[in-house]
């Protein structure tokens, strides 16, 4: 797993208070990890802060799973 | 109260919960209170050395079993950061009260007949402070989505209703330091009028932060002369008093319509015996000479007590904040009780826990119920040299054993808002 993936996972565990084993790439923040819409807003902010990236609202709306977040951030960092 | 609107519905207290500088827990707080312990110490929530007032009554951290605050025992870790501390403390007291009452709505009708009215004087002050720093440092887009629901006063009521499924009236009182009494009194009326059969009511406060202490310092309301001797700082009616001591915590009761409580065999702490309110229409922070507003609030409470007189009242839990206003309340109580003042006991429990602002009236109403139950009047600590004499026994230094059937509690708030509530022994 990449450094980015590790860090994303850590942020999710911390913010949603879920067990690390549940934070699989396909896990949906809302359906699998107990987040509500406000939690996902806060998660995106935490990603922005941790990775020094801007995630516009329309992009944030498409980030539904752990993998979505990792892919988006990796793409931004590669650009 | 007369007329048909209330159908003679009586309101009793079937659950109590307290978070105070003496302990987390209604009974441990009460035990320490009547032992004469003080919950006042140097402020540790932040470094107070820049401010003239440096002592307060902070809720102690520690294991729940020892009366300390272990937040994860009350609020799941992942939810804690979505709430200001005043919500944490309010929920801890409310959960105690609900569990103490044993009330668990079984069906939708029960849920819809159970409401919540828990207020606060100030709300999420530390949250607002932190949020404004985020915005002023150019990071407005980073402001937490939980900023607003963390600071809003009615969110204790909101969170509690979500936790237990209470779908009745969901409300919150905001009347500064009178909040707790107004919440219990107003919630009782909702039950009397049939809007609910059960109401969880009270107040919570957590304003011991730099902004809160600095604000009350600027208003010249806080004690500044006992920073080196914190337990001596809160001294209601004493000639050396020099301002109030900020406290934090929460008090919550479960109010229940009498027949509802009887049907389920609930334990009954006491009955709401009367409730009265008034406004000073005088000054934003100071009561008028003679404290006519306090007099009228007590009179109004007696008026709708169903026939009680001043001769029936055995104990007054005073507002008594350790400020100049103490003697004005004393004037009003003496005038109100007349000849009956001679047999009255009156104490200020703020001498031990400080002034819990929006939680004060609720915590003090619970002390009245415990005083009635145990036949013990809690003391006024530090009343070494009363600024003036009175025929009223102000229970200096040590608790007294005394039969108490009826107690009255006063709370007054900035803006000139006054509330008095009468608690009485439950009799069929």
Swiss-Prot record, chain A:
Membrane-spanning ranges: none
BP-aspect Gene Ontology terms: lipid A biosynthetic process
Superkingdom of this protein's organism: Bacteria
Record flagged with keyword Acetylation: no
Subcellular location: Cytoplasm
InterPro entries, A to Z: ACP (IPR003231), ACP-like_sf (IPR036736), PP-bd_ACP (IPR009081), Ppantetheine_attach_site (IPR006162)
Post-translational modification: 4'-phosphopantetheine is transferred from CoA to a specific serine of apo-ACP by AcpS. This modification is essential for activity because fatty acids are bound in thioester linkage to the sulfhydryl of the prosthetic group.
GO molecular function, one term: acyl carrier activity
Short name of any one Pfam family annotated for the protein: PP-binding
Keyword annotations: Cytoplasm, Fatty acid biosynthesis, Fatty acid metabolism, Lipid biosynthesis, Lipid metabolism, Phosphopantetheine, Phosphoprotein
Metabolic or biological pathway: Lipid metabolism; fatty acid biosynthesis
Record keyword Hydrolase present: no
GO cellular component, one term: cytosol
Residue ranges occupied by any Carrier domain in the UniProt entry: 2-77
Modified residues (O-(pantetheine 4'-phosphoryl)serine): 37
Family indicated by similarity: Belongs to the acyl carrier protein (ACP) family.
Role description: Carrier of the growing fatty acid chain in fatty acid biosynthesis.
Protein name: Acyl carrier protein
């Amino acid at each position: 797993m990449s450094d980015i993936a590790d860090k994303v996972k850590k942020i999710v565990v911390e913010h949603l208070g879920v067990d690390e084993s549940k934070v699989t790439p396909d896990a949906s923040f809302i359906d699998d990890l107990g987040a509500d819409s406000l939690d996902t807003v806060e998660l995106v902010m935490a990603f922005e802060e941790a990775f020094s990236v801007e995630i516009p609202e329309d992009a944030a709306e498409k980030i539904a799973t752990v993998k979505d977040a990792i892919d988006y951030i990796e793409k931004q960092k590669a650009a | 109260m007369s007329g048909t609107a209330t159908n003679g519905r009586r309101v009793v207290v079937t659950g109590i919960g307290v978070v105070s500088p003496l302990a987390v827990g209604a009974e441990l707080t009460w035990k320490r209170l009547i032992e004469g312990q003080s919950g006042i110490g140097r402020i540790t929530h932040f470094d107070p050395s820049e401010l003239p007032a440096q002592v307060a009554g902070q809720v102690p951290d520690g294991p729940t079993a020892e009366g300390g605050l272990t937040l994860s025992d009350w609020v799941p870790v992942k939810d804690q950061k979505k709430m200001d501390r005043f919500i944490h403390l309010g929920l801890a007291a409310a959960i105690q009260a609900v569990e103490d009452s044993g009330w668990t709505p079984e069906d939708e009708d029960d849920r819809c007949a159970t409401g919540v009215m828990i207020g606060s004087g100030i709300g999420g002050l530390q949250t607002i402070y932190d949020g404004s720093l985020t915005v002023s440092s150019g990071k407005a887009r980073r402001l937490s989505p939980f900023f607003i629901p963390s600071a809003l006063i009615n969110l204790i009521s909101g969170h509690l209703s979500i936790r237990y499924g209470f779908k009745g009236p969901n409300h919150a009182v905001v009347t500064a330091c009178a909040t707790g009494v107004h919440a219990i009194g107003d919630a009782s009326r909702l039950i009397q009028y049939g809007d609910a059969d059960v109401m969880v009511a009270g107040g919570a406060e957590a304003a011991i932060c730099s902004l809160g202490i600095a604000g009350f310092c600027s208003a010249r309301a806080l004690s500044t002369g006992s920073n080196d001797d914190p337990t001596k700082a809160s001294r209601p009616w004493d000639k050396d008093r020099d301002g109030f001591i900020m406290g934090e915590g929460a008090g919550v009761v479960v109010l229940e319509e009498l027949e509802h409580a009887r049907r389920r065999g609930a334990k009954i702490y006491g009955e709401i015996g009367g409730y009265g309110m008034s406004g000073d229409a005088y000054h934003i922070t100071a009561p008028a000479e003679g404290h006519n507003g306090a007099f009228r609030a007590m009179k109004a409470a007696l008026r709708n007590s169903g026939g009680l007189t001043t001769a029936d009242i055995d104990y007054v839990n005073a507002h008594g904040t350790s400020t100049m206003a103490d003697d004005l309340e004393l004037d009003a109580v003496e005038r109100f009780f007349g000849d009956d003042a001679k047999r009255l006991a009156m104490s200020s429990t703020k001498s031990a826990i400080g002034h819990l602002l929006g939680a004060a009236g609720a915590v003090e109403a619970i002390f009245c119920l415990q005083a009635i139950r145990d036949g013990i009047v809690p003391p006024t600590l530090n009343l070494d040299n009363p600024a003036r004499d009175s025929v009223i026994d102000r229970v200096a230094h040590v608790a007294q054993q005394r039969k108490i059937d009826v107690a009255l509690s006063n709370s007054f708030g900035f803006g000139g808002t006054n509330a008095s509530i009468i608690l009485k022994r439950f009799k069929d």
